[in-house]
Amino acid sequence: MNFTNLEQYLNNGIESLVKDALRKTLMNPKETAFLVQYGLSVKKAEALRHKTAQRGGHIPSFLIASITSQCNLNCAGCYDRVREAPSVEEEMSREDWGRVFTEAAELGISAILLAGGEPLKRADVLEEASRYASILFPVFTNGIMLDSACVNFFEKNRHLIPIISIEGGEILTDARRGSGVYTQTMQAMKSLKEFDLLFGASITVTNDNLSDVIREETITELEEKGCKILVFVEYVPVASPSLALNDAGRTLLEERLASLREKREMILVSFPGDEKESGGCLAAGRGFFHINAAGGAEPCPFSPYSDTSLKTASLREALQSPLFTKLRENGALIGEHTGGCVLFDQAEYVQALASNP
């Protein structure tokens, strides 16, 4: 798939998500008003990206930003704890992130996924993000810190959308995240529902929980809690290879999601499974890239190698970095893609490219 076709694919994906969200929030005037306004911003962003494409460049439609490595939980097999995380002192400042958000808006980037660690530990960065209404900021949180003040903040800034991470039901969630965590996340969802906020859930899919998380009962329970978005993230085998889905598991997940999309009101997203339709991996700026807490521009969260820092470089410079350019041009991202993480399987190769720009 060339960049022209890819641009249209990504644009169509964002427009489809906005239309789905509008349809699912018609009974909520505040949410509908926000989504209509955001839909206009999406069109303007598409026009900006198209201008760049006409000049032979390419701007991805979204970014992933891990704004902190700090966390209030100690989940079993946590990817962020396996990798060498930056210290608090090394993390990007509010001003650093503000510069990134400003340039993202100017380039036509429509969404920035905020992750961690626990992103709610960086209230200063969330406050900074609230200033950029043209960008959608899904905030991937464990939900423990979602107190009344935090819910009020999200109510006032509806372009920041809480996405609460769970592992499925109570037994599975507490087994990985700690006793009592599931109850606290359900209470957080209750609070968000009381404010009629658009929010979602994120589930890391493993061989252990696959059969549970794709059950009708699981989806129904989340819908009843007020959840409008459900993101399925395939487990990347950083700690326990046996937990990673095999081809049969990925096929089952794909088939169940196709069935659920036909009859459910939820917005259902699979990552990286949905990338298959784009002709390959979207990392390294092809569809997105990852910014770690210290500012390193990485191909994706599961390929933690960088040759460029956003503390000193611009987003445009990061997109044109030697590492990203080589990955996009040498075929490492393109071709048959059947789920899982393409670059994780090429870790040594990516690391070598980053070390030898």
Give residue spans per PLM region:
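Short, charged low-complexity linear segments at domain edges
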Residues: 40-60, 275, 309-326
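Conserved alpha-helical substructure of the radical SAM core
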Residues: 2-149, 157
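Short cysteine clusters
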Residues: 71, 75-78, 281, 295, ...
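Short loop/turn microsegments at loop-to-beta-strand junctions
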Residues: 63, 285-287
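Radical SAM enzyme [4Fe-4S]-AdoMet core and its adjacent flexible, acidic
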Residues: 1-10, 174-284, 293-298, 307-310
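Radical SAM/AdoMet-radical enzyme domain recognition
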Residues: 94-114, 120-233
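Flexible mid-to-C-terminal extensions adjoining Fe-S/redox cofactors in radical SAM and related proteins
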Residues: 21-24, 297, 301-357
